[in-house]
């Protein structure tokens, strides 16, 4: 692969990415790109971002050796990158802080966001309150039912939560509504996209704000083990936690990178959210990437036990990493994720998010095939408090 320097000036990762949006949004995206590039060159902006990540988010978080789990599985040593310990309980806050600082720098008084599991909505509401901005979060009706505690948290933090009743009433539809809002209110409003999808410059901007995950993990692994990890594993919905972990390792060819999509009820059932594993290239939400679509190019409905993975597309950089073979993409089913959720609870005393449990499920498959002197880093992208009611209901327990 040589030196990795993507995206290009037009936001392309090979044939993926780009800026497929209404003409009315082009000036806003160009303004955003200029502001972001200026901020990246500004030592004061970088210093404030670093300070906020330390003092407000609580970084660096640990790279934790799951010793009991590793012994029980046999094979590779499993290390967990503890994004669940961040303020607000997931990786999402890294990007929300970065984009909110950028919004403030651009003089925007109102921020909007889309959310699936609610974690990005909570993170955006949190930073909007911190920096004194009005906040509106779009969320699909089905996700509002699945993640009612996060909806209440957003409202506690002062955000307005708007239910989206169109389409599948999930993340895809929330994103559509947020884009419509932005087109209408582009002068006053900053759209805080929560994943590495969307039109350029969002995929590169969100990646850069999340690369702190991989930068920390790389240094921590060298400190703890004296060498780089053999394998990185992260769940992939839109793909922000995964690209945050993977990006600093892309040129380290000996390090395997594996993204785990939502296998739902099984890849053969059509009831899943695995565009990289089963989909094909197309255009959605302003960028070209792998999608779940039918023969006519219509987006197919998705299913996952996890609201945060329930999305028919994926970030364009993941599409490129798949095609070049630098990263591998697999799927874990609802059932496998639930089993992994329980196993981590009972071996390490950590309750993971159902999204993260998909990554754990694949790590549990892979570790026994490796040697005990090899290491796997799993990105524990979030904590599972938000999923307690979902898991209890599936097991017939009424909370």
From Swiss-Prot:
Pathway: Amino-acid biosynthesis; L-tryptophan biosynthesis; L-tryptophan from chorismate: step 5/5. HAMAP family: Trp_synth_beta. PROSITE patterns: TRP_SYNTHASE_BETA. This is Tryptophan synthase beta chain. It holds the Pfam family PALP. Gene3D superfamilies: 3.40.50.1100. CDD domains: Trp-synth_B. Belongs to the TrpB family. Its cofactor is pyridoxal 5'-phosphate. The keyword Amino-acid biosynthesis applies. The beta subunit is responsible for the synthesis of L-tryptophan from indole and L-serine. GO terms for molecular function: tryptophan synthase activity. It catalyses: (1S,2R)-1-C-(indol-3-yl)glycerol 3-phosphate + L-serine = D-glyceraldehyde 3-phosphate + L-tryptophan + H2O. Keywords: Amino-acid biosynthesis, Aromatic amino acid biosynthesis, Lyase, Pyridoxal phosphate, Tryptophan biosynthesis. Its EC number is 4.2.1.20. The keyword Amino-acid biosynthesis applies. The modification N6-(pyridoxal phosphate)lysine is found at residue 92. InterPro entries: Trp_synth_b_CS (IPR006653), Trp_synth_beta (IPR006654), Trp_synth_beta/beta-like (IPR023026), TrpB-like_PALP (IPR001926), TrpB-like_PALP_sf (IPR036052). Tetramer of two alpha and two beta chains. GO terms for cellular component: cytoplasm. It comes from the Bacteria.
């Amino acid at each position: 692969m040589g030196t990795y320097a993507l995206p290009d000036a037009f936001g392309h990762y090979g044939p993926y990415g780009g800026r497929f949006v209404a003409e009315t949004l082009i000036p806003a995206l160009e303004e955003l790109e200029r502001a972001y590039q200026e901020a990246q060159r500004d030592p004061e902006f970088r210093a404030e971002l670093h300070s906020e990540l330390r003092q407000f988010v609580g970084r660096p978080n640990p790279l934790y050796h799951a010793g009991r789990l590793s012994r029980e599985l046999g094979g590779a040593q499993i290390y967990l990158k503890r994004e669940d310990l961040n303020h607000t309980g997931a990786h999402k806050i890294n990007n929300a802080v970065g984009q909110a600082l950028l919004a403030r720098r651009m003089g925007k008084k109102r921020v909007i966001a889309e959310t699936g599991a609610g974690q990005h909505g909570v993170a955006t509401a949190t930073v909007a309150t911190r920096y004194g901005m009005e906040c509106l979060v779009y969320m699909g009706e089905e996700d509002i039912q699945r993640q009612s505690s996060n909806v209440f948290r957003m409202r506690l933090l002062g955000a307005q939560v708007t239910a989206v009743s169109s389409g599948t009433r999930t993340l895809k539809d929330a994103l559509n509504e947020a884009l419509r809002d932005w087109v209408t209110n582009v002068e006053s409003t900053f759209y805080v996209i929560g994943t590495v999808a969307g039109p350029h410059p969002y995929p590169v901007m969100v990646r850069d704000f999340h690369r702190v995950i991989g930068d920390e993990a790389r240094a921590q692994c060298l400190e703890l083990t004296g060498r780089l990890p053999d394998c990185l594993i992260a769940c992939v919905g839109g793909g922000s936690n995964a690209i945050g972990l993977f990006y600093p390792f892309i040129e380290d060819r000996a390090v395997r990178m594996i993204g785990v999509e939502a296998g739902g009820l099984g890849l053969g059932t059509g009831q899943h959210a695995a565009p990289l594993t089963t989909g094909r290239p197309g255009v959605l939400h302003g960028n070209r990437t792998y999608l779940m679509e039918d023969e006519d190019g219509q987006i197919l409905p998705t299913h996952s036990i996890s609201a945060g993975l329930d999305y028919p597309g994926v970030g364009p950089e993941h599409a490129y990493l798949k095609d070049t073979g630098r990263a591998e993409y697999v799927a874990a089913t609802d059932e496998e994720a639930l089993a992994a959720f329980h196993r981590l609870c009972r071996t390490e005393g950590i309750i993971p998010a159902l999204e993260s449990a998909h990554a754990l499920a694949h790590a549990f498959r892979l570790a026994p095939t490796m040697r005990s002197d090899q290491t796997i880093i799993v990105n524990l992208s979030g904590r599972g408090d938000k999923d307690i009611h979902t898991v209890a209901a599936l097991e017939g327990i009424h909370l």
